[in-house]
Amino acid sequence: MDAVLEPFPADRLFPGSSFLDLGDLNESDFLNNAHFPEHLDHFVENMEDFSNDLFSSFFDDPVLDEKSALLDMELDSPAPGIQAEHSYSLSGDSAPQSPLVPVKMEDTTQDVEHGAWALGNKLCSIMVKQEQSPELPVDPLAASSAMAAAAAMATPPLLGLSPMPRLPIPHQAPGEMTQLPVIKAEPPEMSQFLKVTPEDLVQMPPTPPSSHGSDSDGSQSPRSLPPSSPVRPMARSSTAISTSPLLTAPHKLQGTSGPLLLTEEEKRTLIAEGYPIPTKLPLTKAEEKALKRVRRKIKNKISAQESRRKKKEYVECLEKKVETYTSENNELWKKVETLETANRTLLQQLQKLQTLVTSKISRPYKMAATQTGTCLMVAALCFVLVLGSLVPCLPAFSSGSMTVKEDPIAADSVYAASQMPSRSLLFYDDGAGSWEDGRGALLPVEPPEGWELKPGGPAEQRPQDHLRHDRADSIHETTKYLRETWPEDTDDNGTSPNFSHPEWFHDRDLGPNTTIKLS
């Protein structure tokens, strides 16, 4: 074991025996009082109720019936309400986790002045510290008590102990009873509290994770609090050092006699709360309870300071971000204004260019459009001329009655019976006279023989004049009915070629060239 032990006077603590009878102790007693590592500290809270019983069992053992002067102190277990020290003490797990906060360091010589019980089997070690009395002689048999706890879990109650090598003990004057200020290296997970000035409040550590609201949660009695092993602080001595702790080290409250040195913060808080300031050990129950309450308030104060510090840092960070974003926004606005100005300038230049281009190119376009229209008109005129030249080549059409002219020689065959019945269109000429006139020309009727005509009268000359006048019209009338086929039977409104009277022919001298033949 690496624990440094301070020898006890064996002739007074263990008279007549060279070993410690551990028959009344069992494995659970040592485990319940063991100081577990950081990741097992939550087991300690459930097992702290057995710590006072274990500590009292060392002195209630039958071997120790003869009490010495050192054992005349009060060994009564504290009240249930204050079974544990506060979680913000040096033995708790509420050490400041911030690496920026300086931590109080004590010299390793403090460990030499105190003895320790150590469990070297598994997890922990139990150290029992006792201040050396200058008038008591040093006995090498005291070292044998350090080996009793090492084999308590694996051996019978009675154990053979072997002496351990001891480190040299610093020399003290016979009348020197006060404890000198020392510096001790502690691990960063141990609770360290600093007394700082108001301007240093920003550098307070973060809120301890093990702070609780209950009165006895996370606290231990000063006399039942086991200090940590001196080997662990030696390995972690690289932490920062400060010179003004806010709370008194818990191992200083474990002494059974001697003066009690409290920090200025604790004294001020005790006075403010109306409690008396304890000056010597051991502490009474009332003093212990008051001191516990004061330490808890100091810890809450530290937590509040840390919370304010974090909030202040957060607000400062936000303010810096706001300033940065504001500057970036202003720069972006300037860029936007520059781009808008450039855009307006480019638009003006574009309008000027469009005006110039329109003024120079519009005239040729108009001329080209005029030339195109002229060409189209010329092409249309040429087409009309060509079409007009082709019109005389077409067959001639009559513009008046649209009648068909035929040779007069074919007039004799007008009423020839056709071999096949057919229909023909009838054309009527308004200027050619009525149909009855033509009919009269075709069928002239001579007056009866009894008519007397005066020579040279109008009645005598009328037939000849009429026939001469209608000669040309008869030819025209016959052409209107070319190849006309008359039906055999017609109605009353029609005209049939079959007359009701017998056909008769009458020859009349109408002229040398006039011949009328009816068939």
From Swiss-Prot:
Where are the glycosylation sites? N493, N498, N513
Alphabetical GO biological process terms = endoplasmic reticulum unfolded protein response; extracellular matrix constituent secretion; mitotic G2 DNA damage checkpoint signaling; negative regulation of endoplasmic reticulum stress-induced intrinsic apoptotic signaling pathway; osteoblast differentiation; positive regulation of collagen biosynthetic process; positive regulation of transcription by RNA polymerase II; regulation of ossification
* Membrane side Lumenal: residue ranges: 398-519
Q: Where is this cross-link: Glycyl lysine isopeptide (Lys-Gly) (interchain with G-Cter in SUMO2)?
A: K184
The free-text tissue note of the record is: Expressed in cortical and trabecular bones. Highly expressed in osteoblasts, but not detected in osteoclasts, nor in macrophages. Expressed at relatively low levels in lung and kidney. Weakly expressed in brain and spleen. Expressed in astrocytes.
Q: Where is the composition biased (Low complexity)?
A: 210-223
Q: Pinpoint motif S2P recognition by residue range.
A: 392-395
Instruction: Report the transmembrane regions from the record.
Output: 377-397
Q: Which domain of life does this protein belong to? A: Eukaryota
Entry's Gene Ontology molecular function annotations: cAMP response element binding; chromatin binding; DNA-binding transcription activator activity, RNA polymerase II-specific; DNA-binding transcription factor activity; transcription cis-regulatory region binding
The UniProt disruption phenotype note reads: Mutant mice are born at the expected Mendelian rate, but show growth retardation. They exhibit severe osteopenia, involving a decrease in type I collagen in the bone matrix and a decline in the activity of osteoblasts. Osteoblasts show abnormally expanded rough endoplasmic reticulum, containing of a large amount of bone matrix proteins, including COL1A1 and osteocalcin/BGLAP.
Leucine-zipper: region residues: 332-353
- The residue ranges flagged as biased composition, category Polar residues, are 236-246
Explain the post-translational modification: N-glycosylated. Ubiquitinated by HRD1/SYVN1; undergoes 'Lys-48'-linked ubiquitination, followed by rapid proteasomal degradation under normal conditions. Upon ER stress, SYVN1 E3 ubiquitin-protein ligase dissociates from its substrate, ubiquitination does not occur and CREB3L1 is stabilized.
Q: Name one Pfam family in it.
A: bZIP_1
GO CC terms for this protein?
cytosol; endoplasmic reticulum; endoplasmic reticulum membrane; Golgi membrane; membrane; nucleoplasm; nucleus
Localization, UniProt = Endoplasmic reticulum membrane
Q: Where is this region: Disordered?
A: 200-259, 449-519
How is this protein situated with respect to the membrane? Answer: Single-pass type II membrane protein
Q: Which InterPro entries match?
A: bZIP, bZIP_sf
Q: How does it assemble?
A: Interacts with SMAD4, the interaction takes place upon TGFB1 induction and SMAD4 acts as a CREB3L1 coactivator to induce the expression of genes involved in assembly of collagen extracellular matrix.
**Protein known as:** Cyclic AMP-responsive element-binding protein 3-like protein 1
Gene giving rise to this polypeptide: Creb3l1
